[in-house]
Amino acid sequence: MDIAQLLAADGVVLRSGASSKRQALHTVADTAARALGLNENRVLESLLEREALGSTGLGSGVAVPHARVEGLERVVAVFVRLDTPVAYDAVDDRPVDLILSLIHI
């Protein structure tokens, strides 16, 4: 499967002013909610629950937060590029500026 097939319509943010991990995840949730007609708080809560299990910061400035939103049956991706890297508890302790989020809907 091509990643372009996973990207939600309007699921790309090339310039986010988020200045913290939580704000970055809020941007992901907002983008997914608007693109897919979902409740933003529901998406954000799912992302935060998953992050509480362990950081999804892969290193080299990349994070792959993911979540399952109950009742939905496909996987969609949201891409966010931050203007300024943020602390993310990544495995290499480097800040993150590229976020590819997978939402199972």
Residue locations for each model-derived region?
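Cytosolic covalent-transfer regions centered on His/Cys nucleophiles
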Residues: M1-I103
